[in-house]
From Swiss-Prot:
Belongs to the bacterial ribosomal protein bL31 family. Type B subfamily. PANTHER family: 50S RIBOSOMAL PROTEIN L31, CHLOROPLASTIC, LARGE RIBOSOMAL SUBUNIT PROTEIN BL31C. This is Large ribosomal subunit protein bL31B. HAMAP family: Ribosomal_bL31_2. It comes from Amoebophilus asiaticus (strain 5a2). The gene is rpmE2. GO terms for biological process: translation. It holds the Pfam family Ribosomal_L31. Gene3D superfamilies: Ribosomal protein L31. The lineage of its organism: Bacteria, Pseudomonadati, Bacteroidota, Cytophagia, Cytophagales.
Length: 82
């Protein structure tokens, strides 16, 4: 492998913003934000909206998503004109 062309693979903290769940793993993603982890060290912080801690498939909770407004808007926009 060529040196200097590959991204740095390091430990980062992912924060699920919807459930406030944090987990430490390794990634090549960059972030300007950092967070102090349980071991006392600072790691880059990557914020995500959805993870296994909040996704309905993994949690078993069913969440109703209100799409009625979008469907009605679509139907009005593309309804046949008689």
């Amino acid at each position: 492998m060529k040196k200097g062309i590959h991204p740095t693979y390091r430990e980062v903290v992912f924060l699920d913003t919807s459930s406030n769940f944090k987990f430490l793993t390794r990634s090549t993603l960059n972030s300007r934000e950092t967070i102090k982890w349980e071991d006392g060290q600072e790691y880059p912080l990557i914020k995500v909206e959805l993870s296994s801690a909040s996704h309905p498939f993994y949690t078993g909770k069913k969440i109703f998503v209100d799409t009625a407004g979008r469907v009605e808007k679509f139907q009005q926009k593309y309804k046949k004109r008689s």
